[in-house]
């Protein structure tokens, strides 16, 4: 296996037994690909912006004398880059420019004669762009658009499961769901009549829609029923016989021909009888007259002599009617064939309840249902019906809908029109009647073949189309207004509605969410999330148990583990590791193809629909060396069930054991030994881990850590290979390899690193280089670690030495006892960055001013501010300190004569302004790390703003100069090579300044040309440098675009150092969470025989009932990994020979049974071995993939190699007494996370604070500076104790007795500790409520 530069430094020993057939795909592709399709120009015009434009344009005027046509579009360049947008609070977007053509036709001339054509490019608003990490920057904050899982368009057959009607009868229904347009529902009622609903409105008999489609009663009966022909001859009645139709019926007369009785009266007709009738080729039989009575005629019958209608189609025959027909000379009578078994008379019955008789009355009935209260006209009724399902503007099934529709109706063709046809509606009815007759099955709505993914691109396209449709109306009006000779396309289009629609979607849609940026995993999970909520989806309240449940089709597509606990459980899911979407938006997962029992490496992606037809083996099925199944019977999945199949029957095999889980769950080692409920908590809690000060890779991982860290985009990854030219804390420069360079470029890549920036969750984002000068890197190698990454691997927490034992009750109820050493070594210290903003506005009384001259504030409070009134960078501030001094003008107050006199004597002038400075929130002590000032255009900048500007310009100039220097050096290197090859010695060159080299003449023409080309490049480079500098200077010095009425914004960034303390929440990766109960001195912690104390003591009772045994196995394996690290460390200390070191490390890597990934250290140089050993001395890193991890036996082998007891338990001694504990204790290394539930953010106490407006009771919650609720049950407690005075105090002066609490405050100030309780305000509220009901209550003194 080839290792990258960073991987060589620390290789994970992999315990996986199965080879990786398919690489893990790029984890953010679902977001990036979808958005790419949206903005990419699609020549077919089936998706993206192109599709939206083509669906709305051309727009014709009402008179059709002019039209506006769409030609093409282009996206411009964004004004600010991503970083600048975040700092300025802007949206990262590009202007959309559309080329439109205005065509005016001659009114008098023949149709289509063009009078005038004008073409122009029109600005159509801004389109937010996706960053390379799959996010959007909207108003300066990073947001993610979550994909939605919604019901696919198409036709669905379902039933009410017998819940609607009291009899428990199952009522079937069909629903045609378009991508956009009206829904069409067909449903049976308890009397078996078929009804239709349009858009869930009032129901109508289903035959109304058939009549509206211009079918007569006879046509309808011909469509849905087979016919039976009766003939009257010689006063006898004969019937044309189709023997199969008699099956299952009870004969009401003897069926006999020529004296031979086939079926006796009263007997049921069986298959044997039918075979006999077929054999004897019986086609007609005589039936008694009673047999035809009650049958329904299939057509109209007219008396040919008089032209009078005897009976219309769908009339039941009676004796009288039969006599009439016979008299009128009708010898043949056709009836419809129905029976109680499998040919129900539902349509015939429905026709009887249908009040309409012809097309017009049907259209009028539909119009009345859709538009109640409006008078119907023929034209209006026809237009309405036409627009419902047959107009491309109003109705679209979409390609997906048509494909699902045709598949459901078992048609061969899967493409077709986006609107419905007559045949479509009739076939849906036929299938629904077939299901009612017992043929066919209903659909499963929760099957992933019936639910599809709607990603960012598609949702943005829909929003954009909505905006365009709004514009279309306005354009139509303007085209019809006349005077088109002077108008240009620009005058037709108002971009506001389009911008508004797009802005609304990205800014406030339920699916456009504030990105969870706690750590790299939470980012990646958020982008791979799939929600069933949102517009056009489900709601929490209505979603039942079935929708939330794990469905067999989730396998390999949606993770069965990772979903939130609480009301959203099962509605918000996560994409599985290998899952992706197909062209129709259905989820697919990869499988290896199997031919005659041999598994190949050919990969096929199957969707849930296709998957059902195949037999699929699991990834852990045993194969021999040639890829054949070893066992004859293999556990496989087929049609959602698991069972044993012969190996020849297998069609496909899973790609990987981690195929079924999501990224979050695939990071939990020994997941297969954890209960699913705890695994769910573990996967969710990893997302809440706060990045620690120094990231520490997990000793026991799953091998997914590198993929997550690299794909999340928090690390800095080499775009092209080359050698490292320069490294410092904030920038890396790489000289690109010759073969990866573009022609004519200098071949230098410069990476500027993120330093101490704030994330959405206030955690700290900081990148640290992990390469050295002069080293060779390849494309895709990690150059710098981001937050929570260590050498390019995800590192959410710290490896801690844990012991499972009780310790003086400090680990009661999942509490955690932590050693003081953890705090001293800053293992779980985190940095939080808070942003505080001070806004200076223009008020009615004058503008607010940022200044250090604040009334009634002492010198001490101003000590950390500069002369502009803004805090210094580096100042250490505490709660209540002023960060930005600001004064607000206040209205003049009327002064008393005494005050005027004092004012005159002491000359206090600052009375007309009040202090409104920005202060540090209570309870925060922090360091100021950055200040940014934004000033409105046209407002004079203060001194501090100019200083900051100057500093930024200097920094930019320095950056660009260094960039230029590096590029120049590379270019002059190439110039030197040309000159030397042209015969000039390097000595001569060293005497001349570099710029002069370009003037040197060369004898060879080819060399001279090369030199001139390079000289041109040099001039271009300098010009480019000047241009870049000018652009940056303009951006920095121009005024900022601030909200109306805002003059200036000062943003102060504070860094808060959070050490671990009692009350903080910690967790492992297996759902084992707890709160720190005590930080214990190191000397009191339990220690082993060598005197090494443990770091954390966990409760052993947290394991058995929770059934997350994975944590115990992780602890044992962690102990073994650390033990091997210790042995390597000892060897390094003794300066052992490299060959011995190599041999020991090789032995550790080779351990295990049938491990597929072996490491060959013989290819490593001695230097690389030492570098590897240096990284392994703190513990050997191990990967145990999900469902394919280390076995107990292998853990024991590793413990043995590390000279540790194979039980995984050791004797511990009490740190306080030195006595040995009576039993050996499980001790090992577990990966612990500190979660973003810090006690500092939760701890809160209230002094006098805010009160509710109506009830005058104190508010609740930390954000409102509220108190603790003294609720109903607490009142009962005081009543039970008989503490009357305490109770009175609680319910009056401490709560809502306004006068009482004011009086009490005065009393306390006066030193008088008495209270007088009055009437609580809430009692007055009650009185008012009662009065509002018209009952007057008055209180007597």
UniProtKB/Swiss-Prot annotation:
SUPFAM superfamilies reported in the protein's UniProt record: beta and beta-prime subunits of DNA dependent RNA-polymerase
Gene3D superfamilies: 2.40.50.100, 2.40.50.150, 3.90.1100.10, DNA-directed RNA polymerase, beta subunit, external 1 domain, DNA-directed RNA polymerase, subunit 2, domain 6, RNA polymerase alpha subunit dimerisation domain, RNA polymerase Rpb2, domain 2
Assembly mode: The RNAP catalytic core consists of 2 alpha, 1 beta, 1 beta' and 1 omega subunit. When a sigma factor is associated with the core the holoenzyme is formed, which can initiate transcription.
Assigned protein family: Belongs to the RNA polymerase beta chain family.
Reaction equation(s) it catalyzes: RNA(n) + a ribonucleoside 5'-triphosphate = RNA(n+1) + diphosphate
Key words, A-Z: DNA-directed RNA polymerase, Nucleotidyltransferase, Transcription, Transferase
Superkingdom of the organism of origin: Bacteria
InterPro entries per record: DNA-dir_RNA_pol_bsu_ext_1_sf (IPR042107), DNA-dir_RNA_pol_bsu_external_1 (IPR019462), DNA-dir_RNA_pol_su2 (IPR015712), DNA-dir_RNAP_su2_dom (IPR007120), DNA-dir_RNAP_su2_hyb_sf (IPR037033), RNA_pol_bsu_bac (IPR010243), RNA_pol_bsu_CS (IPR007121), RNA_pol_bsu_protrusion (IPR007644)
EC number, as in UniProt: 2.7.7.6
One GO CC term on file: DNA-directed RNA polymerase complex
A GO molecular function held by the record: ribonucleoside binding
Top EC class, one word: transferase
Protein name listed in UniProt: DNA-directed RNA polymerase subunit beta
PANTHER family linked: DNA-DIRECTED RNA POLYMERASE I SUBUNIT 2
Organismal lineage: Bacteria, Pseudomonadati, Pseudomonadota, Gammaproteobacteria, Enterobacterales
Any one Pfam family match given in the protein's UniProt record, by short name: RNA_pol_Rpb2_45
CDD domains: RNA_pol_B_RPB2
Annotated organism of origin: Hamiltonella defensa subsp. Acyrthosiphon pisum (strain 5AT)
GO BP, sorted A to Z: DNA-templated transcription
Role summary: DNA-dependent RNA polymerase catalyzes the transcription of DNA into RNA using the four ribonucleoside triphosphates as substrates.
Transmembrane intervals: none
């Amino acid at each position: 296996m080839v290792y990258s530069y960073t991987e060589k430094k620390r290789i994970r020993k992999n315990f996986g037994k199965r080879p990786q057939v398919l690489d893990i795909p790029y984890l953010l592709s679902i977001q990036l690909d979808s958005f790419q399709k949206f903005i990419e120009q699609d020549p077919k015009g089936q998706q993206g912006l192109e599709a939206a434009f083509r669906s709305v344009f051309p727009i014709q005027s009402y008179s059709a004398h002019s039209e506006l046509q769409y030609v093409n579009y282009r996206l411009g360049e964004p004004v600010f880059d991503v970083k600048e947008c975040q700092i300025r609070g802007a949206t990262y977007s590009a202007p959309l420019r559309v080329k439109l053509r205005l065509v005016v036709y001659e009114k008098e001339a023949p149709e289509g004669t063009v009078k005038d054509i004008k073409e122009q490019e029109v600005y159509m608003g801004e389109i937010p762009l996706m960053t390379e990490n799959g996010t959007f920057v909207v108003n300066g904050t990073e947001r993610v658009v979550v994909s939605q899982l919604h019901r696919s368009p198409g036709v669905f057959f379902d039933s009410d499961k017998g819940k609607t009607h009291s009899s428990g009868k199952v009522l079937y229904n069909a629903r045609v769901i378009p991508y956009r347009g009206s829904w069409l529902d067909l449903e049976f009622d308890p009397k078996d009549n078929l009804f239709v609903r349009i858009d869930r409105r009032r129901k109508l008999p289903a035959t109304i829609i058939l009549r509206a489609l211009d079918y007569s009663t006879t046509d309808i009966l011909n469509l849905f029923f087979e016919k039976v022909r009766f003939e009257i001859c010689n006063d006898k009645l004969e019937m044309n016989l189709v023997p199969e139709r008699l099956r299952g019926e009870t004969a009401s007369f003897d069926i006999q021909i020529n004296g031979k009785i086939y079926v006796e009266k009263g007997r049921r007709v069986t298959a044997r009888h039918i075979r006999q009738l077929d054999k004897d080729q019986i086609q007609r039989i005589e039936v008694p007259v009673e047999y035809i009575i009650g049958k329904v005629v299939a057509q109209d019958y007219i008396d040919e002599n008089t032209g009078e209608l005897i009976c219309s189609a769908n009339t039941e025959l009676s004796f009288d009617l039969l006599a009439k027909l016979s008299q009128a000379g009708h010898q043949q009578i056709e009836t419809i064939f129905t029976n109680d078994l499998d040919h129900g008379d539902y349509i015939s019955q429905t026709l009887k309840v249908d009040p309409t008789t012809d097309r017009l009355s049907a259209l009028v009935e539909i119009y009345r249902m859709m538009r109640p209260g409006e008078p119907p006209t023929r034209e209006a009724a026809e237009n309405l019906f036409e627009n419902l399902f047959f107009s491309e503007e109003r109705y679209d099934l979409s390609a997906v809908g048509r494909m699902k529709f045709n598949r459901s109706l078992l048609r061969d063709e899967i493409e077709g029109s986006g609107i419905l046809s007559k045949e479509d509606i009739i076939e849906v009815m036929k299938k629904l009647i077939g299901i009612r007759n017992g043929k066919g099955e209903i659909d499963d709505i929760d099957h992933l073949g019936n639910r599809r993914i709607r990603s960012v691109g598609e949702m943005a396209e829909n929003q954009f189309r909505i905006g365009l449709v709004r514009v279309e109306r306005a354009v139509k009006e303007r085209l019809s207004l006349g005077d088109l000779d002077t108008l240009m396309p620009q005058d037709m289009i108002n971009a506001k509605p389009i911008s508004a629609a797009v802005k609304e979607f990205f800014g406030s849609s339920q699916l456009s969410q504030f990105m969870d940026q706690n750590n790299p995993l939470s980012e990646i999970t958020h982008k791979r999330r799939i929600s069933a909520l949102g517009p056009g989806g489900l709601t929490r309240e209505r979603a039942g148990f079935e929708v939330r449940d794990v469905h067999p089709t989730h396998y390999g597509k949606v993770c069965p583990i990772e979903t939130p606990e609480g009301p959203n459980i099962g509605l918000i899911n996560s994409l599985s590791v290998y899952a992706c979407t197909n062209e129709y938006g259905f989820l697919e997962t990869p499988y290896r193809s199997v031919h005659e029992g041999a598994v190949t490496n050919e990969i096929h992606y199957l969707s849930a629909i296709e998957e059902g037809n195949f037999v699929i083996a699991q990834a852990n099925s045993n194969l021999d060396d040639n890829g054949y199944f070893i066992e004859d019977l293999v556990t496989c999945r087929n049609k959602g069930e698991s069972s044993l199949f012969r190996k020849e029957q297998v069609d496909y095999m899973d790609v990987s054991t981690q195929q079924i889980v999501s990224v979050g769950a695939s990071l939990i080692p020994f997941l297969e030994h954890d209960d699913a409920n705890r695994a769910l908590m573990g996967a969710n809690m990893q997302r809440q881990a706060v990045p620690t000060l120094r990231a520490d890779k997990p000793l026991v991982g799953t091998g997914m850590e590198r993929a997550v860290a690299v794909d999340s985009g928090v690390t800095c990854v080499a775009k092209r290979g080359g050698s490292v030219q320069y490294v410092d804390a904030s920038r890396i420069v790489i000289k690109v390899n010759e073969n990866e360079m573009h022609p004519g470029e200098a071949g230098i890549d410069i990476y500027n690193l993120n330093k101490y920036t704030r994330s959405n969750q206030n955690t700290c984002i900081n990148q640290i280089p992990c390469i050295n000068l002069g080293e060779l890197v390849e494309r895709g190698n990690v150059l710098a670690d981001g937050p929570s990454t260590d050498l390019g691997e995800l590192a959410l927490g710290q490896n801690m030495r844990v012991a499972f034992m009780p310790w003086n009750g400090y680990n009661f109820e999942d509490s955690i006892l932590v050693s003081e050493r953890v705090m001293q070594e800053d293992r779980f210290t985190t940095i939080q960055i808070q942003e505080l903003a001070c806004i200076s506005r223009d008020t009615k009384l004058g503008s607010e001013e940022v200044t250090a001259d604040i009334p009634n504030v002492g010198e001490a409070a101003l000590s950390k501010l500069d002369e502009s009134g803004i805090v210094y960078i580096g100042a250490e501030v505490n709660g209540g300190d002023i960060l930005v001094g600001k004064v607000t003008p206040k209205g003049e107050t009327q002064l008393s004569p005494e005050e005027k006199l004092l004012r005159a004597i002491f000359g206090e002038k600052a009375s007309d302004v009040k202090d409104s400075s920005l202060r540090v929130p209570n309870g925060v002590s922090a360091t100021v790390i950055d200040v940014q000032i934004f000033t409105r255009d046209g407002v004079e900048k203060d001194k501090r703003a100019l200083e900051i500007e100057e500093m930024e310009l200097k920094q930019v100039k320095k950056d660009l100069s260094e960039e230029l220097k590096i590029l120049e050096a590379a270019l002059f290197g190439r110039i030197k090579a040309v000159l030397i090859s042209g015969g000039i010695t390097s000595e001569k060159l060293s005497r001349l300044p570099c710029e002069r080299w370009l003037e040197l003449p060369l004898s060879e023409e080819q060399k001279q040309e090369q030199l001139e080309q390079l000289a041109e490049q040099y001039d271009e480079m300098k010009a480019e440098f000047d241009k870049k500098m000018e652009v940056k200077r303009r951006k920095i010095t121009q005024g900022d675009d601030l909200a109306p009425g805002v003059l200036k914004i000062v943003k102060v960034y504070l860094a808060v150092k959070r050490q671990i303390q009692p009350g903080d929440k910690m967790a492992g990766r297996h759902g084992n969470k707890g709160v720190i109960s005590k930080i214990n001195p190191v000397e009191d912690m339990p220690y082993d025989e060598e005197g090494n104390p443990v770091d954390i003591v966990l409760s052993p009772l947290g394991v058995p009932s929770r059934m997350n045994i994975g944590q115990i196995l992780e602890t044992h394996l962690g102990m073994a990994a650390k033990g091997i690290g210790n042995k390597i460390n000892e060897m390094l200390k003794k300066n052992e020979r490299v060959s011995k070191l190599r041999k020991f490390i090789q032995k550790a890597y080779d351990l295990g049974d049938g491990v597929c990934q072996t490491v060959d250290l013989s290819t490593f140089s001695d230097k690389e071995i030492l570098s590897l050993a240096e990284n392994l001395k703190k513990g050997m890193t191990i990967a145990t993939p999900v469902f394919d991890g280390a076995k107990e036996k292998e853990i024991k082998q590793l413990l043995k190699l590390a000279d540790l007891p194979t039980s995984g338990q050791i004797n511990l001694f009490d740190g306080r007494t030195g006595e040995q504990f009576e039993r050996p204790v499980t001790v090992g290394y577990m990966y612990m996370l500190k979660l973003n539930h810090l006690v500092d953010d939760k701890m809160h106490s209230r002094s006098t604070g805010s009160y509710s407006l109506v009830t005058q009771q104190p508010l609740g919650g930390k954000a409102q500076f509220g108190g603790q609720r003294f609720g109903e049950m607490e009142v009962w407690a005081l009543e039970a104790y008989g503490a009357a005075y305490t109770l009175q105090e609680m319910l009056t002066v401490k709560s809502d007795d306004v006068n009482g609490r004011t009086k009490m405050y005065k009393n306390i100030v006066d030193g008088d500790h008495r209270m007088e309780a009055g009437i609580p305000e809430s009692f007055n509220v009650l009185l008012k409520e009662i009065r509002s009901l018209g009952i007057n209550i008055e209180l007597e003194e």
